[in-house]
Amino acid sequence: MNREEVQLLGFEIVAFAGDARSKFLEALTAAQAGDFAKADALIEEGNNCIAEAHRAQTSLLAKEAQGDDIAYSVTMMHGQDHLMTTILLKDLMKHLLEFYKRG
């Protein structure tokens, strides 16, 4: 896989992880306002974005596992960082929503 291909996957991961992060933060705002149906819908949208980011990540991992030489890319590293922090936010959202639901 050449550098450009790896960078494109990195940009995909950044974009999807960024969209997921935005959805999760919107969900938190909705929960703060007591609109849990909206929060749940936004979390589902965020989860779909995470799934797309994972799809891009998995395609890269599969190519490496098949023996392809993967070019180093700061863009890909940046994408991985975005994905990791967004997944952490997703995990924390579960606990935060419980606090808001309890009142």
Curated annotation (Swiss-Prot):
Induction behaviour: Induced by lactose, galactose and galactose-6-P. Repressed by glucose.
Keyword Signal appears in the UniProt entry: no
Subcellular location per the Swiss-Prot or TrEMBL entry: Cytoplasm
InterPro entries on file: PTS_IIA_lac/cel, PTS_IIA_lac/cel_sf
Residues in PTS EIIA type-3 domain copies: 4-102
Record's keyword annotation contains Aminoacyl-tRNA synthetase: no
Function: The phosphoenolpyruvate-dependent sugar phosphotransferase system (sugar PTS), a major carbohydrate active transport system, catalyzes the phosphorylation of incoming sugar substrates concomitantly with their translocation across the cell membrane. The enzyme II LacEF PTS system is involved in lactose transport, but can also use galactose, isopropyl beta-thio-galactopyranoside and thiomethyl beta-D-galactopyranoside (TMG) as substrates.
Record's comment describing the protein's domains: The PTS EIIA type-3 domain is phosphorylated by phospho-HPr on a histidyl residue. Then, it transfers the phosphoryl group to the PTS EIIB type-3 domain.
Protein name as annotated: PTS system lactose-specific EIIA component
Organism this protein belongs to: Staphylococcus aureus
Lineage of the organism: Bacteria, Bacillati, Bacillota, Bacilli, Bacillales
